[in-house]
């Protein structure tokens, strides 16, 4: 019996040692896997940091600027606090006027009033001149604060509640006034949302025009790129490579050079008009630049390779036996193409269309140079607010709306077609 117990103990000891070895081996494998993952993460860290610094953070900063309103609440804190009890009816009470006069004078003396005046002028036209005039006159007074009547004597416009409503509407640290303006809406003197005056309703129409032009450019690129991609995929390699170099040639040329070349071709005294006059096709020169036509033509030329390449890569992977099998079963060439070949190219169509549409909807330099006033897109208005009017909040709101619409379209595209079905390579 003791011999059997000794043998059993030996077996158990061996099993324990085997189990410990397996545990140690698993721990070593897990440690090795963690090292591999850490090494992979370290290799991708520069790329992640680059994307965050150049892509994610600028977008987040743009979205924050579109709603940031700390400038008013920090510059006029007592006035904003006193306006909380005002109900948009009649003149604000004396406490508001007293706080306002003291704070405006302090801003005028510290040279900070022009910045606030510019911000308020965005919300209500005429506020810049009103605030600067009020600041100058307050600096000449011997005693402060002043009364409601005295403020109205400085400028009679202070008797109009709409100017006080502008301050109350901007009382919070965050505001959606830029987004309302981007949708051609405004907050009136009673605190209600209403449409902008007709002469100031420009952004919604410009958004629709931008989407219409982007869709048109995408469809034209698809119609032109499909036969070119088909030819590339079915030619012998030697000829296909030569044609592919021609397709890629625009990428080796500056975008500015390609855009200005269309100015040379399309202008009234340009090459195309000269050929039309010489051939007798027309006796008058045709306006083909500084309009929507010029923008569409030049952008189709610039974006065409982005449609050709995804189509070509997908078509290259389609076996010709499918088409021949359909023909051998009695299908006409048209039926075989529509029911067999074209459905197989849908991933390439989706990838090319999505890429072309996203690029065209945010294009800036070509509409700016070729489009003129009638051929501009929403990107040109964003650039105007960033460079000329310096209204970064409005630029951020327009960019935010454009980003939102693109994300909605991307989501719808994913639900209908499926992002997993897109292909940019064979």
Give each language-model segment a name.
Residues 1-42, 61, 65-204:
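Membrane-topology segments of multi-pass transport proteins
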Residues 4, 312-323, 327, 396-426:
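C-terminal transmembrane helix and the adjacent membrane-cytosol boundary/short C-terminal tail
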Residues 28, 32, 61, 217-248, ...:
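Transmembrane-helix boundary motif in ABC transporter permease subunits
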Residues 33-37, 240-241, 292-294, 319, ...:
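Amphipathic cytosolic juxtamembrane alpha-helices at the membrane-cytosol interface
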Residues 49, 247, 301, 307-312, ...:
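Transmembrane alpha-helices
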Residues 200-231, 342:
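Transmembrane alpha-helix signature in integral membrane proteins
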């Amino acid at each position: 019996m003791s011999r059997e117990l000794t043998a059993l103990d030996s077996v158990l000891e061996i099993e324990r040692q085997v189990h410990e070895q397996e545990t140690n081996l698993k721990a070593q494998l897990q440690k090795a896997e963690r090292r591999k993952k850490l090494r992979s993460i370290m290799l991708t860290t520069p790329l992640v940091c680059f994307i965050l610094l150049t892509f994610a953070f600028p977008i987040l900063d743009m979205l924050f600027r579109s709603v940031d309103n700390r400038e008013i609440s920090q510059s006029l804190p007592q006035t904003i606090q006193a306006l909380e009890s005002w109900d948009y009816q009649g003149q604000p009470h004396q406490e508001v006027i007293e706080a306002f006069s003291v704070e405006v004078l302090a801003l005028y003396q510290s040279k900070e009033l022009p910045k606030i005046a510019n911000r308020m002028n965005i919300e209500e036209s005429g506020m810049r001149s009103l605030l600067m005039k009020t600041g100058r006159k307050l600096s000449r007074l011997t005693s402060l604060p002043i009364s409601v009547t005295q403020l109205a004597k400085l400028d009679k416009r202070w008797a109009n509640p709409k100017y006080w409503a502008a301050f109350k509407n901007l009382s919070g640290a965050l505001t959606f006034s830029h987004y309302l303006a981007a949708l051609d809406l405004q907050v009136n003197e009673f605190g209600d949302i209403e449409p902008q005056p007709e002469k100031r309703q420009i952004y919604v129409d410009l958004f629709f025009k931008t989407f219409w032009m982007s869709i048109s450019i995408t469809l034209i690129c698809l119609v032109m790129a499909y036969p070119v991609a088909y030819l590339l995929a079915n030619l012998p390699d030697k000829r296909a490579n030569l044609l592919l170099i021609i397709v890629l040639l625009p990428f080796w040329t500056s975008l500015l050079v390609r855009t200005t070349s269309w100015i040379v071709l399309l202008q009234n005294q340009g090459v195309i008009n000269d050929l039309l006059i010489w051939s007798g096709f027309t006796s008058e020169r045709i306006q083909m630049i500084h309009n929507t036509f010029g923008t569409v033509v030049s952008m189709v030329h610039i974006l065409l390779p982005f449609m050709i390449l995804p189509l070509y890569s997908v078509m290259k992977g389609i076996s010709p036996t499918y088409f021949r099998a359909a023909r051998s079963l009695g299908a006409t060439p048209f039926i075989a193409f529509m029911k067999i070949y074209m459905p197989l190219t849908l991933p390439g169509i989706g990838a090319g269309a999505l890429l072309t549409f996203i690029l065209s909807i945010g294009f800036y330099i070509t509409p700016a140079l070729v489009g003129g006033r009638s051929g501009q897109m929403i990107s040109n208005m964003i650039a105007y607010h960033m460079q000329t009017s310096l209204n970064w909040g409005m630029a951020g709101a327009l960019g935010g709306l454009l980003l939102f619409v693109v994300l909605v379209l991307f989501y719808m595209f994913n639900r209908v077609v499926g992002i997993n079905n897109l292909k940019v390579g064979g």
